[in-house]
């Protein structure tokens, strides 16, 4: 009994000492609140990708193409994803598109949400121009809500502007929305720039009419540009209306390359930014797209001046712009020719199979 009594007293005093010590520790090391602002810092990944007639099965069964895109999305994890040159989804009897009805949902199920379950939704799409191809915008519905869209141009193809808003944790109480406008396009291809110059110039004129000042805005897609002195490119970065000039991040912000630029004539000077082609040989893995390896920089993401301001709610993260899968050594090589350490080999193979185009991506910071 003496042993048990002594043991009990020892445990009692240990318990008291622990209880006394606990408040002291809390006072010595103040606990920071888990959340100091309703808007936590965040990073938004923005990606534009020409998917080469995705939907018409020219490159292979849609289920197979879904699996390639699933691999790419699982790696890149975009929060805003623009797919351009999707085979048009028929919405009427006179539409030219050959994608199956409901193909946008099929992309969600078989590719995007298969990679990241429950994450993605898509915006409304149009094809008033009755083109064979169209653009689809997807977004991370855990970070953004869809507000509205407008068709800005319907010439050869539709160019739509989408209005998204950031999902503030306190949005239901404050009703304070931070909008982000995304213009997604695929201009006319070909060596003669007249059609694409007209499309982009009309787009810029429409933007000027819409907004008394440029909001948080991105213009992205496949511009089919050969050089920076084309009228369409100049309409974006050097518009006659000085308050409506956009930035091409590798040039204007990161200063990695300089104007004037002609990647058609000197691709080696822009090797890490080239987006056409992922394939060295024309008929491999299929004959649905161009070969010739990396030679053209058709795909861009332009940002409004507000997004270049580090104090803005949305702001470009310097040097985040990059071409996924392009390590700068693709001038005479396919994307999956080794060595290429810019992405895992499985992703490189998926890029090779999915399209003859490389995707481009940048990151936006989100600050309280």
Segments predicted by a language model, with ranges:
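Solvent-exposed loop/turn segments at secondary-structure junctions
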Residues: 51-56, 86-90, 127-132, 142-145, ...
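Metal-dependent phosphoester-hydrolase catalytic domains
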Residues: 209-217, 225-368
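Sec-dependent signal peptide recognition
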Residues: 4-11
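Extracytoplasmic, non-cytosolic globular domains
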Residues: 51, 60-76, 81, 104, ...
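Short, solvent-exposed loop/turn and secondary-structure capping segments
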Residues: 57-60, 92-97, 148-151, 175, ...
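Beta-strand-turn-beta hairpins that frame and shape the catalytic cleft
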Residues: 37-46, 139-146, 156-187, 364-368
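N-terminal, active-site-proximal structural segment of metallo-dependent hydrolase catalytic domains
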Residues: 2, 16-135, 180, 329-331, ...
């Amino acid at each position: 009994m003496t042993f048990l009594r002594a043991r009990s007293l020892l445990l009692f005093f240990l318990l008291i000492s622990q209880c006394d010590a606990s408040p002291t520790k809390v006072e010595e090391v103040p606990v920071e609140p888990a959340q100091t602002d309703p808007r936590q810092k965040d990073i938004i990944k923005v990606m534009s990708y020409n998917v080469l007639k995705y939907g018409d099965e020219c490159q292979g069964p849609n289920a197979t193409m879904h699996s390639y895109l699933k691999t790419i999305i699982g790696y890149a994890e975009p929060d805003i994803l623009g797919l351009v040159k999707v085979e048009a989804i028929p919405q009427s009897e006179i539409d030219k598109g050959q994608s199956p009805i409901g193909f946008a949902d099929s992309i969600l199920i078989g590719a995007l949400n298969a990679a990241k379950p429950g994450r993605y939704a898509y915006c409304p799409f149009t094809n008033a121009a009755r083109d064979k191809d169209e653009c689809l915008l997807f977004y991370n519905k855990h970070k953004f809500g869809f507000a509205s869209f407008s068709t800005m141009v319907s010439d050869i193809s539709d160019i739509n502007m989408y209005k998204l808003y950031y999902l503030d944790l306190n949005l239901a109480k404050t009703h304070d929305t931070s909008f982000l406008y995304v213009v997604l396009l695929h201009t006319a291809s070909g060596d003669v720039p007249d059609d694409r110059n007209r499309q982009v110039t009309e787009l810029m004129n429409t933007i000027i009419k819409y907004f008394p000042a440029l909001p948080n805005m991105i213009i992205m897609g496949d511009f089919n540009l050969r050089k920076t002195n084309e009228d369409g490119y100049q309409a974006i970065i050097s518009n006659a209306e000085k308050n409506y000039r956009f930035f091409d991040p590798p040039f204007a912000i990161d200063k990695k390359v300089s104007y004037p630029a002609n990647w058609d004539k000197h691709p080696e000077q822009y090797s890490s930014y080239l987006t056409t082609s992922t394939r060295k040989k024309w008929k491999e893995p299929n004959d649905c797209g161009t070969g010739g390896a990396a030679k053209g920089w058709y795909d861009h993401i332009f940002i409004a001046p507000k997004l270049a301001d580090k104090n803005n709610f949305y702001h470009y993260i310097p040097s985040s712009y990059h071409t996924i899968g392009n390590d700068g050594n693709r001038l005479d090589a396919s994307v999956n020719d080794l060595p290429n350490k810019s992405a895992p080999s499985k992703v490189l193979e998926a890029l090779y199979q999915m399209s003859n185009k490389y995707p481009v991506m940048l990151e936006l910071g989100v600050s309280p």
